[in-house]
Amino acid sequence: MIPSITIDSTKCVTDLCFLGQVYNTDKSPYNSIGHRHPYTAVYTLLMAQYKHNPIRFVEIGIAGGASVKLWNKFFEKGTFYFFDRDQNFLDHSAQNVSSVNNTFALMDVSIAESIRESLEKTGGSIDLLLDDSSHNATHQNLIIHEVIPFIRSGGMIIIEDISRDEPEETYFNMLKDIYFEFSFVSFIVTEHANRYSPGWNNDKLLVLIKK
């Protein structure tokens, strides 16, 4: 089975937490609009090594574009690739950041070929890939399987918004054929006094580090 870690970040406030509040992203428990996932303190723990260093960063699923601004502000030397199934989301976000280090392209996470073809635009050697797209377990499984060749050794995949109601065995069964590709795999159940995700109950991550 896939191990699980629970992190309560109520007493841990980071720069990324505040940036999440500033840009109104639901990744921060201090977001003032809509859902409040307690991810930003955990992300600081996982990503701080890249804050002042070059990073090749991919996010799948950008919706209104709050996280596009967040990552551009946090990673000072980042090269970014953002994907979504909605061209309007991509066009809107592209207006808010530099075209020099940001690439936007369509991707349909329900189709393996679309995932592969879109990721080919990155040139591979991805340091960190974050999925915030459909939150569908089948699609999340497709993403993990298809992104492996594009992730560098030691690179990280983070799947956001795993349903706490979904049996963890579901993910183990989907990933057991590629489990050997990773040096670390774990769920992270994220807790915070401000946690708020009514109707979803999906404050949970799946983190995978490639061998």
Predicted feature descriptions by range:
Residues 1-130, 134-159, 163-211:
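A short alpha-helical cap/connector motif
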